[in-house]
Amino acid sequence: MNNAIKAGEVFKLAELLPYQDGKIINMDVAHNEKMKFVIMSFDEGTGLSEHAAPGEALIFALDGEGVIGYEGKEHHIKAGENFKFAAGGKHWVKAKSRFKMALLMILN
């Protein structure tokens, strides 16, 4: 577990990671050989190129708005919404505005 998160304290995932102009930054929250939980912040217009998910994954939009390309179709997502990837699903992410998300991935 990441040391930035203290036991017995209330926190907001979206506040653990700042935005940086022109950049995408991420923070591992927790991981082991079977799962990975990461938060990411995207400056407006930045994104991840298409790649395949190594395992099933859930996206939790924490702040702002983004677009997820999944298997050839675009899906708009905003804070409070979620999205699922199947293992091997080809996808990309782009920030429409400054955008933060959490990713929970089950590793095979």
Predicted regions and their residues:
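Ligand-binding loop in jelly-roll beta-barrel domains
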Residues: A87-N108
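Conserved short histidine dyad/triad with adjacent acidic residue
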Residues: K23, K36-A53
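Structural motif
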Residues: E65-V67, E74, K90, K100
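A short, N-terminal "cap"/entry segment at the start of jelly-roll beta-barrel domains
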Residues: M1-K34, G69
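Short, conserved beta-strand element in jelly-roll/cupin
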Residues: S41-D43, P54-I68
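Short acidic-glycine-tyrosine-enriched beta hairpin
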Residues: G72-G88
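A cytosolic small-molecule/anion-sensing beta-strand core signal
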Residues: L62-D63, K78-A79, S97
